Each structure stands twice: as structure tokens, then as C-alpha cells.
Amino acid sequence: ANVVCSLGLESPAILLSSLQLDAFRRGERLVTESHKRGIRGAYFLSTSLELAPHGARAWQIIADIDLAQGQVVERIRLFRDPGRAGQVIAHSVDAGRDELARIVGAADGFQSTAEEAVTAHHYANVLFNILRGGIFDDGYRVSATDFASSVRHCNKRVYERHQELLAALEESLTIGQLLSSVQQGGDPQLERLCYEYLPITFGRRHGDPSRPWNKFAIRLKDESGERLLSYEGNWRDIFQNWEALAFSYPGFIEYVVAKFVNASTVDGYNPYRITRQGIDWEVEEPGNAWSHIGYWGDHQIIYLLKLLELSRQFHPARLSALLRSPLYSYANVPYRIRSFAAIVADPKRTVDYDRALEARIADRVALMGADGRLVLDAGGNVYQVSLLEKLLVPLLAKLGNFVVDGGIWLNTQRPEWNDANNALVGHGVSMVTLYYMRRYLHFLQDLLATDTGPIELSAEVAEWLADTSAALADLRPALGHGPVSAEQRWRSTEALGLAASRYRDAVYREQPFSRQVSTPLEQVTGLLEGALAAIDHSIRSNRRETGVYNAYNLLDLGPGELRVDPLYLMLEGQVAALSSGAIEPEAAAALVEALFDSTIYRADQRSFMLYPDRPLPGFLDKNRVPAASVESIALLRRMTEAGDRRIVSRDVDGCFRFSADFTNVDDLDARLYALREAYGDEIEASRAPLRTLYEQVFRHREFTGRSGSMFGFEGLGCIYWHMVSKLLLAIQENFFAALDRNADSETCRRLGGLYYRVREGLGFNKTPAEYGAFPTDPYSHTPGHAGAQQPGMTGQVKEEVLSRFGELGLRIAGGALRFDPRLLRECEFTSQPRQFQFLDADRQWQELTVPASGLAFTWCQVPIVYRLHDGPPGLTIVSKDAGTRQLPGLALPAGLSDEIFRRSGQVRRISVDFPRALLHL
């Protein structure tokens, strides 16, 4: 039940409904309502006050919701004593405010600069990032009891084998100490569970409430009232938030990587939901039109890659050490992707639901725990493979759908990042994914550059790798001379698709993998080289004359040939292209400049739509069949003469139209089948031209989904702020890449200026009237006809948390931190000294003075103070044990950097002094 009451007013009239509001408007006396039923409830207070000059009166309306009966009785007793109740509420509000501030402070949400809107916006971004993805409960400290509970939930056998080890753990220990103790046990199964363990709290599901997984609940206590560690969310979103969180908690990066790859399937995809309890997937419900299954594979590569890149930056040797370690699992999702031939025959219906497998999985979960949803070996244990295998399988899955000059074929029944493009499924190919794959390939090449010796792979994966490499080798001679022929494109698509299809046939068994085999590393590096050549060729083919890039193309499948046609300009494609690493700094600047002159720029918001706005045809302008086309098809000519309106009919104005019963070409085929007796051989003779005419009239192939027919969310005229913030971060990456490559100063200046021009369009730079909402809060989207919509429900927060730390110049490479303020502006530095309150690594509130010409922020909960001065750049490090020391330049040694990464508390403060000349002008 819900309890509502008030404090601070003497004998007010209390209304439990809105029935007396008109009487109030007429100035009539209101009568207290003690009970109402059958109508919508409310709670209003009415009284008269007399205030002396400069006087004040305060009162409160308090609501407490979802209470059990015993709790209601407690509240009633409390509010019988208004004085005590007021004290309890004031204490609760203060405690809640402090606890929320501690949560945000622990994720580095507090900053102090001369631009208050910037720091307030950063606070909001950090807060919403936590609300979506959660936060680590106690820094790097974990509870042995909670870890043991997690092991027991996941795998009862492993828990029983290691009860003695688990019982011997100290109750509170660091995640590093926990891993070390687990490794001493010598059981890879337990080590896998340790790497998957994420002590996260406070996060709640997010997003569109119409989706079944979004039930907006922050669960902080269990049924017994004990503190609860929990998280859940759509995998496409929660891993984004964990990326930004891991930047402040780098010690957990490899654990997040493990959680990601351990949830991917044998066929290379991730099920739609991830929770502390394990993985989850959509279940097919026959007869339910809203039930749907399939895989989103679009940003799987880039989300994983961003985590891998963080690991290499912070811990340069750690991934290499894990590459060969058999600590990673496969999710066992009861989806079965059809054969290549079946996909070609109907690319929109490609995934079957295996109910027999679903039942077996349920039995295994009941027997062993959540690990029953993973692939098991012949002995009933979780089948574990190396990290390298887990990194190769999603790449091979994408290459199995690679269309040269086109992108990655969207044939797993789900769209890409933009759900509004859902109609692209089946006949769309994604350059977006291909741009990100290029970056992924380069990363793997760098990761393996110093590795030698053979690797262990599952035999079926090794064969898939070899078949894919052979298909890419056959394609190689056709590359580099402009787009390949339609026939060559089909041959390569078929070869790659059949390789993936044979692999799926092999692993869609009760026991998917037969054995592990030793594979020369050269086979892997050869695959990467061949794939990169084909992808670079395709990227060149998709650059437009204006310097922008295609995002998606459309497939046109014919007998023995495959053609691709580009769709219209999309912001998503430009962001992915900028992120690919394929564009030189000067070309990157030209691309962004072209966007400001393009049809996706909205001058009223100083920002970018997802795609160009365009007028839609009216109802009567649709479904118009040219009379000449009707006359040219014998069947239509005969049916029209006979007055048979079952395929086309003529309206009173003489316009021919297809039957209103038809939803798509399948309905046309069904009608033709039904007409066989009446029209005989004319049916088959007219089928192909009729189908062609139907597509010419409706152009269904070009229909992208609600993106081309709606106006809110990701519709026409809409700005989607997450994609704008992705653009911002991509420009920042190109800015720093230009500096690292020693690009000319003019190009660097252009990129920096373009960064701030894009940033200027974000809400926190606008008035409430211009933005249509609270400017400092992140919002999902701004349609063309309204202000910003859906507060906080956006991946924008993750991008902007990272881009903000980039603005401040935090750059990590080779396990060391350096400060690079060349994107920071002088307007952020204060003119007068001010106080800055922050939460330190020991969870204590501290305060420091920010000097004039300074600013302050925290990172890994270490306070960092910047100060502009006329001398050379230098650092002042205040340490817990070593006192104060000064270092020339702006780079920290790896040892000191590691103290910060580990949140050891040794580094208490860093002061960074540098001249104005280093700032962005």
C-alpha cells in the first residue's frame, strides 16, 4: 500500500480526490475527505496562511510507497508524533542526499570549473550512467560471502568442490586478492566464475518501458532485508555503461570483458539480456504477433573492442597473458540459425527456436545452477576455451555474412543499433559494422604482433577459420580495382556463407565441440590480413564524392549475382567511419565539415538528425499502378477485362491500385496460388513481372522501418542525442590521433574546433526554451515538432563521460597516465580561488582549495588540480607514505599510475601546472 501524509500545517482540509477542485477555484470552503472509492485518488491540502513581512512558513507532503501492512502500521504510529516524524524525515533526506552524493563521487562525478553548466552536465551524465549500469559496491573490495553465494548460484558442483577454499577467505578482501586465492585452487571453472564476478549495485533497468525487460527497479536489499548486489539489462546497453564505469575502475576491466565474452554463443552472438543471475533470451510464442526472436549483432564488435582497448591501455600485458587461458565459456541459447541456402531463399526468416534444447537447458539449470545455460563438455562441466577463440568467433560470424562492397548482411532477424531501421532486416547490409570490424582487426593484429607459437582452438572453430581464410584468399585478386562484379560478389558471399553454415551444422549438436586442436598462429594472422584487405576495399567503395560514407546498402540478389545499392545519408555511418581508423586526419575534418553542410544538419538545434527529413506521400498518393503496366501484364489485362478485382482494381478516377488485402509480396503470391484454377498457365507466366511491378509500386526494399514513417524516437526530423555524442567522441579520437601522428597544426586546429562546434549543439549549452527540457540533463531524442524527450534513458551518458575526461586530457597508454590538455579551453579555468569537495578513495569527504586560474576534478577518486602558470609543465604528487614530490613534464611513471588505477590510497592528490600555450585556442 501507499501512505501519504503532511507535516507543518495546522488542521488543513485534506482532499483524497479532485472532485472539489472547481469549488476551490470558485473560492468556496473545502470539506476534508476521509474516504473515497471507485475514482482516481489524489492528495491535496487546503488552508489559509497569514505571513508577516519577510516571514516564511514551510510544510511537507510525504509519500511512502509499496509498503507491507506492518510497515503501514509503523508509519501511522510515527506520524502521530509530528515533531519526531519531522526529525526522522529530515535525517532520512540528509542521509539519502549524502549516500547519493557518495555514489556519484565514487564514480568521479564531481568537478569544479568556471563553467558550471559543464560540471552540472557531467554530474548528470555520471548519475544516469550509474542508474543504467550500476556501480561497484565498495571500490575494489568484495565480500567473500557474496562471492560464495554467486558461485553456488552459478554452479553447485564447483561450489561443493571448493567449500573449504571459499570458507577460508577473509570476509572483506580486494578483487585481486580474491583472484589470487582462487587461482591457488587450481580449478579453471572456479577461476572463470571469479572473472565473471561483478559486485555491482544500484543499477536498474533502463529504456523504453514497453519492452519486457524494463521494469525500473533499483533493488538494494534481498527478501531478508540484507544488502543486495544486483544488476540486469539489455546487453547492448549495460556494457556501454560499464565501459564508462570501468574507466574509473580499471581494475575491473578484464572482469567485464569476461562477462561479455562468456555470454556469447557458439554461432557468435550475444543473447539479449544479462543479469547477475546469468543470461536470458527471448522465447518464441506461437500466435503472439509481438513475440520475436533473433540476434542483434551490430555493435557487438565495437562494444567488446572498446573494453579490450581499455585493457591494453591500462594493463598492456594482461590480455596477452589471457589469450591462451581456457577460462571462457559459450552461452547455449536455443536459437538455430538456418543454412546459407535457406537464408538466401528467405533472409527475413532465418532463426528457429529449439524447444527441445530449451527443455534440456531448463533441466540442467535445475540440476547445476545458472551455468546450465552454458555449453557443457562430455563430462557435464562448462566447456571452456581461450580468450583468443572467443574473440575470433564473433569476427568469423560477421565475416560469414560479409558482402564485398556492401557490408555485413543483416540476416539474424534483428536490426542494428537503430531499432527504427528494423525493416532493413533481410535485405540490408551494414557498412556500420564493417567500419568497426576494421578497427577490431587492427587491434587483434597489434595484440598478436609479438605472439608466437601455435594456439589451441576447438576443432570446429579451426576448420571455420581455415574455410573463411580460403574464401577471402579467393577474393583477394579482385580487390583494389573498384567495385567487384556482381558475379564475383555472389561467389565470395556464397563461399563465406557456406563456411559459416557448415560450422553451424557441426556445432548445433548435443555436444557441439569434438576436441581442441593445435593451430598455427599464422592461420589467425592470415585471416586478419585477408579480412582487412577486403574491408579496406569495401570502405573505399562506400566513400561518396562529398567525402561522407554510406551507412547501409540494399541487397539485390539474382541468380548467380549480387548487387548492392546505397541508402541515403545517415549520421550513424559517419560516426562509424570516423571510428574505423581508415580516415586520415585531414579527411576526417573534411567529413565533419561536410556534415554541417548536409541535409542531416538541423540549424534550429545546431545539431544532427539521424538521417535527412523528407516529406511523406499522402495516403492517396500511394499504391498507384501505372495503366501501361497493367496493360503489359497478360494476367492483369485479362482480370481487368473480366472485372476481377482480386489483384488490382480501378478507382472512380481511373487509377489502378493493388488489392488493399495485400500487406507484402507474400500475400500477392498467396493470391496468385488461389487463382490457379481460374487462370491456369497465365499465373506462372505473369508471376515474375507482377512481383517486379509490386516492388516498383511499393518499393518495400527501400523501406527502413519506423525511421522512414514516424516522427518521434528515431523517426524523421529527429535528433538522437546518443548518436550525436558518439560523433563527439569520434571527433575527439581523431583529434588525439592527429596529434599522435604529428599532423599539421591547421588540421589539428580544425578538428578541435569541430569538436566544440558539435558539442555546442548539446543541451547543456541551450536555454530551457531552446532545448525543451532541463538543459543539463541528458535526454534521449528531440523530434522535429517538440522539445527533448525521455530524460536519462540514453547511451549518450556513457559517451559524454568518456569525452569529458578526454577534454580534461586524461590519456592512458602502456599502463601509464599522462595529461594532455590540448583540447581543454581557457574558459574552464576559474578567475578566483574556490573550494572543491570530493570523496576520496577511503570514502571520506575531503575539501581542497582550487587556485585562481585553476580547475579540479577526481579520477579513480584521486583529486587532480590543474593550474595555468608561466613556467614549464610539471606535476606535484602528494603521497600517503612518500610525502610530496615534483616531476617535470605531464607524464606519470607506470608505478605511480598503477597506484591510481588500483585506488590504493597512496596517491592523495596531483597538481598539474602548465602554460596557457598548451590549451586549445
Regions found by a protein language model. Name each.
Residues A1-L921:
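Acidic, mature catalytic/reactive cores of soluble proteins
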